[in-house]
């Protein structure tokens, strides 16, 4: 891992980008890890869960370095507090991915015909919100390096709306999943039921935090 001093030597926003890349590397495992669960490849699932934890730890290291060494007097188009808030929200997404991965190692879960397809739609909608937010962050980084005006700023604001739409659609799918889980016809072991609820709740955190991050970026754009 590059030192923070070297990263700041390249650009004041390089550490933010380095942290973002580590967050992406955590979330990228979400679809493969649930696919492994569905297919019964539990050893692969355990390996991926460990990799997610390793990546999350690296993201934490970058976050902590920024908190400790980000110069207060550095001239930037966004405040030091603003940068630290953005990286904190980014980091919460990596935390959520790790939480999901760890939950899947506690007990072997099963997919059931009545919820499998809906769950993967729900997962994909959360990942869609995250991917849109990553696109927004790349646009935001370009704006930071130049200015906050023009069509790029307009494109960034449109992306914020798309993230909010994806998060809402994720909420709708989550409610549909809950209706299945609490229906009289859906009968599974109690421990598995409880663990699935935790998995679904934490998975929803990906789109929740993505929307929060998108709104924080939008606030920065509106301040300019």
Swiss-Prot record:
Pfam families per record: PhoU_div
Superkingdom of the source species: Bacteria
Entry similarity comment: Belongs to the UPF0111 family.
Protein name as annotated: UPF0111 protein CPn_0681/CP_0066/CPj0681/CpB0708
The species this protein was found in: Chlamydia pneumoniae
Lineage: Bacteria, Pseudomonadati, Chlamydiota, Chlamydiia, Chlamydiales
């Amino acid at each position: 891992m590059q030192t923070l001093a070297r990263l700041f030597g390249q650009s004041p926003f390089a550490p933010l980008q380095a942290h973002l890349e580590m967050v992406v590397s955590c979330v990228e495992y979400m679809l493969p890890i649930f696919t492994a669960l569905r297919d019964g490849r539990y050893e692969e699932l355990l390996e991926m869960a460990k990799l997610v934890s390793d990546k999350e730890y690296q993201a934490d290291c970058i976050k902590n370095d920024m908190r400790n060494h980000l110069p207060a007097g550095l001239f930037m188009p966004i405040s030091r507090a603003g940068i630290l808030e953005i990286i904190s929200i980014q980091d919460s997404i990596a935390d959520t991915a790790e939480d999901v991965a760890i939950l899947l190692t506690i007990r072997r879960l099963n997919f059931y015909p009545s919820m499998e397809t809906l769950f993967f739609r729900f997962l994909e909608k959360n990942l869609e919100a995250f991917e849109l937010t990553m696109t927004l962050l790349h646009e935001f980084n370009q704006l930071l390096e130049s200015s906050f005006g023009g069509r790029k700023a307009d494109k960034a604001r449109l992306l914020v709306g798309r993230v909010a739409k994806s998060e809402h659609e994720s909420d709708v799918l989550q409610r549909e999943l809950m209706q299945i889980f609490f229906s009289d016809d859906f009968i599974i072991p109690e421990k598995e039921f409880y663990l699935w609820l935790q998995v679904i709740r934490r998975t929803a955190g990906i789109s929740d935090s993505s929307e929060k991050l998108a709104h924080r970026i939008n606030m920065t754009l509106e301040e300019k």
